[in-house]
């Protein structure tokens, strides 16, 4: 299989060494089983910190996005160095560079590409370019809920849903300003739909279960494109 793994910036914010060890072991197992893997890292609180300071000082949205992109590349380099025996040692900065590095057969790890989108769009573009079997969004919740689980105790996890349902759920939190994206930005959803990319949302604390979740044997959400 060809897999794209998008690691939420929150993974980096937690600074949990066990999570990093588990990620490294999972990636080694996936590669040893003969699958190909690309990883996209989010910008997390480092991106938000720089964007917040810049915004308060009147920096424009394009420049704020660039700050976010560089923060996501910093996270991408952390993963690159942690996985140096498997990974391509340069973080690609656009889709052409990514495609070129992918030919190396190594795990290619990337952050942001260009302003106006989030790293979820990068993950969707990369998935499209390599015809990935699955795009896996590893975040700090177990999957997609019918309501925001942070504010609704009765929120239910949806094990299967389509992009139409997802768009309705995300409607309340959608924004295109730097640093404000939640899970998937509108452009990422458009790309997922136009190329019918299958998306899995799962908790990064259960990364060792990726293959089980893909096969519907463990907790997570599978999003079918409409
Ligand atoms: N960003 C971009 N383009 C990209 C990736 C990220 O402009 O291709 C910026 C956005 O401002 C985004 C921030 O909110 O970097 C951090 O990425 P993310 O963690 O929100 O995905």
From Swiss-Prot:
Binding site residues for ATP: 6-10, 44, 48, 139-140, 145, 148
GO MF, one example: UMP kinase activity
Activation/inhibition comment: Inhibited by UTP.
Domain of life: Archaea
Primary localization class, coarse: cytoplasm
Alphabetized InterPro entries for the sequence: AceGlu_kinase-like_sf, Asp/Glu/Uridylate_kinase, Uridylate_kinase, Uridylate_kinase_arch/spir
Compartments in which it is found: Cytoplasm
EC id: 2.7.4.22
Keywords for the protein's UniProt record, in alphabetical order: ATP-binding, Cytoplasm, Kinase, Nucleotide-binding, Pyrimidine biosynthesis, Transferase
GO biological process: 'de novo' CTP biosynthetic process; UDP biosynthetic process
Pathway stated in the Swiss-Prot or TrEMBL entry: Pyrimidine metabolism; CTP biosynthesis via de novo pathway; UDP from UMP (UMPK route): step 1/1
Catalysed reactions listed for this entry: UMP + ATP = UDP + ADP
A Gene Ontology term for the protein's cellular component: cytoplasm
Residues that bind UMP: 43, 65, 113-119
Family note: Belongs to the UMP kinase family.
Task of the protein: Catalyzes the reversible phosphorylation of UMP to UDP.
Assembly: Homohexamer.
PANTHER family: URIDYLATE KINASE, URIDYLATE KINASE PUMPKIN, CHLOROPLASTIC
Protein name from the UniProt record: Uridylate kinase
Annotated gene: pyrH
